[in-house]
Amino acid sequence: MKRVTITIDGEQTKGIVIGTIAANHTAAEWLLTASVSAKSAKVRFDPEEAVAETSSLVMIAPTRTEKYLYLVPDEQVQPVTTIVRKYGLLSPLDWDCPDYPAGDAFEHLFLQNKLWNDLVTIEREHRAKYRELIGSDEETAQMDTEIASIKDRLSVLDEGRKKLRVEHRKKKCPEIDCLDENIKKLKSELKAVASKAKETRAAAKDRIRAAGNDIENLEKDRQAAVIKAYNNSGLWWGNYNAVLESYKKARIKALKDGAELKYHRFDGSGRFTNQIQGGMSVQDLLEGNRNVASLRLVSSGELGDISGKKPPSLDLQSVGSRRDSREYGILAITLYTGTDEQSKKFRRTLSFPVILHRPLPEGATLKSLSVHRKRVGTDFVWSVVFTFTTDCPTYDQRSSTGNRCGLNLGWKKQAGGGLRVATIYDGSDARHITLPQAIIDGLDYVNGDLQGRIDSAANENHAWLLEQWGGDELPESLQELRSMLRRSKRPHPAKFAKAVIAWRNYPEYLGDARDEAEQRRKATKRLTIEMAHKREKLLRRRMDFYRNTAKQLTSVYDVICLDKMDLRRLALLEKGDGTPNELTKIARKQRQQAAISELRECLSKAAAKNGTQIEQVSTASSATCSACKGKMEQVDGIMWRCRECRALVDQDINAAANLFREVL
């Protein structure tokens, strides 16, 4: 579905395209299979009349209870473009303002986290009742695991048989015959288990159909529990709506992946969301015409005076650069963080110094804004995300080039430095996308040297503190902490810090040792802060590299073909049958550094923006020769050889070439 603007009775109205009717066809058949939401809308056209040209079904909802369905020729439909702008914020100026209740804004973040956890509890209880209603699906899950295990064993035996055939240069010998017999038995076993699994799934579907009314009532109970949870959350509607949207998206993904929603530990992070009814122009935002949000532009010097921080300085090299074109302002947003004596919503404002590294989009309508608070180490980083809509595209509509490519995702350390994360083949040339070595070195330092120093300090501090607190004269409250430390399976800097802070209440007890404990705590804290900030910076650099790469690819190619690979299986330490995953320790580290799921996500977003088509296919792209379609076998590392034509090729280039041929 996409948002569009149409003209009705001479006035422009925004709506959502929910379907398309081809020329010389009617909408009657489409309406028969339409969703409940579409069927409940009032139809403003004759569904039995054939359209002369391809038209779009547009749903208009002027109120929450009214829905109208229009049939509009495509040439009269004007797409609405969504623009998202993210800017950095300095710390709020009135976070602990005496004019407002103490800790009210912080409490609002806590309530949002609590609402999320309440929704997770509701979802888990709903899943448990659903499983109880339709019967246990453990048998089906066990069979799926058994099928996956048999397939893995078949794959291992088949690979061994191929190697023996190459080694003996014939298809028959005692060793190969033994493998053939084992493969035959496994295939027979797989067929029997698959047949039984099919019967089990059919029986489960019958149980679901039989329990249709009960399942419907169970879903109604879940929805009622969700409504009760957000009504009793104590949150303003804009903020509980943001939590609900996150819950709906996470729930759909969890149901699709067979996963479970997880509770969130509250660490002070969160967001404040203002949804602007009817929208607001950029001019209204700058002039402060609406109390929901305002942005007052100031000079860099004034920003420094207000925030108490030194204003950013510019040198001659910055003149004419993007940094030179920055603007500064004070962003004020309205929050409802509680109720007064008359049980009315209590309104307050939060003000932030903001750095506008890029201009706000002209002529756009502001629909919502979110202020985010994220913990990084012991500090918090603030940012604001504006969501605008406009009828004018914000980027040049590129003409079709007809270019296509196959893109194979993976990771491989390059001899010249860097980590290969993808290989592109477009029919004439093959090239690699390489993550810069500077990012790899930084991640190695953070996750290796720095993390190791923190772990060593935690172990040393743990043993040292237990030695200092070994006497019987230890105060009673500290004895409880000592017991907690002794029970800990793994020393942690936070546990040591908690114990040292509690020690401050007893300055007379081992004063010299207490001073040393403070020094140890501060040293560990410095390392922890350094690690958190360096990791955050490196992850931002990697994301920026992937975004730029995705933008370049989608500006050149009309169609990009990817392998439909399940990245979750690569993250598992064990297979379904309990056997270890094939990835080595080094390969696992490189997988985390590459984070190819982020590259795939960036490609998806850039393709949607630039009009590039992403095709995902399931094919044995690495094991099939791109030249003759013969079977490939590994020779040395990344190099594979075809058994038929004896071509020696890079595995990634061969896979990218096979993907390219899928979209020819």
From Swiss-Prot:
Role, per record: CRISPR (clustered regularly interspaced short palindromic repeat), is an adaptive immune system that provides protection against mobile genetic elements (viruses, transposable elements and conjugative plasmids). CRISPR clusters contain sequences complementary to antecedent mobile elements and target invading nucleic acids. CRISPR clusters are transcribed and processed into CRISPR RNA (crRNA).
Recorded family membership: Belongs to the CRISPR-associated DNA-binding protein Cas12m family.
Other observations noted: Part of a type V-M CRISPR-Cas system.
Superkingdom as given in the UniProt entry: Bacteria
Residue ranges, annotated region (Wedge domain (WED)): 271-390
Entry note about domains: Has a bilobed structure, with a recognition (REC) lobe and nuclease (NUC) lobe. The REC lobe (residues 1-390) is formed by the discontinuous recognition (REC) and wedge (WED) domains, while the NUC lobe (residues 405-664) is formed by the discontinuous RuvC and target nucleic-acid binding (TNB) domains. The crRNA-single-strand target DNA duplex is bound in the central channel between the 2 lobes while the non-target single stranded DNA is bound to pockets in the REC and RuvC domains.
This protein's UniProt keywords: Antiviral defense, DNA-binding, Magnesium, Metal-binding, Plasmid, RNA-binding, Transcription, Transcription regulation, Zinc
Region (Recognition domain (REC1-C)): 213-270
Cofactor annotation: Mg(2+); Zn(2+)
Location of the region described as RuvC-I in the Swiss-Prot/TrEMBL record: 405-618
Recognition domain (REC2), as annotated region: 138-212
InterPro entries for the chain: Cas12f1-like_TNB
Binding site for Mg(2+): D652
Single annotated GO MF: RNA binding
Annotated coiled-coil segments of the chain: none
Residue ranges of the region described as RuvC-II: 651-664
Record flagged with keyword Magnesium: yes
Residue numbers spanned by region Linker: 391-404
This protein's name: CRISPR-associated DNA-binding protein Cas12m
Listed GO biological process terms: defense response to virus
Residues covered by region (Target nucleic-acid binding (TNB)): 618-650
UniProt: Zn(2+) binding residues: C625, C628, C642, C645
Binding note for cofactor: Binds only 1 Mg(2+) as opposed to 2 usually seen in other Cas12 enzymes; lack of the second Mg(2+) results in loss of target DNA cleavage activity.
Segments of this protein annotated with the region Recognition domain (REC1-N): 1-137
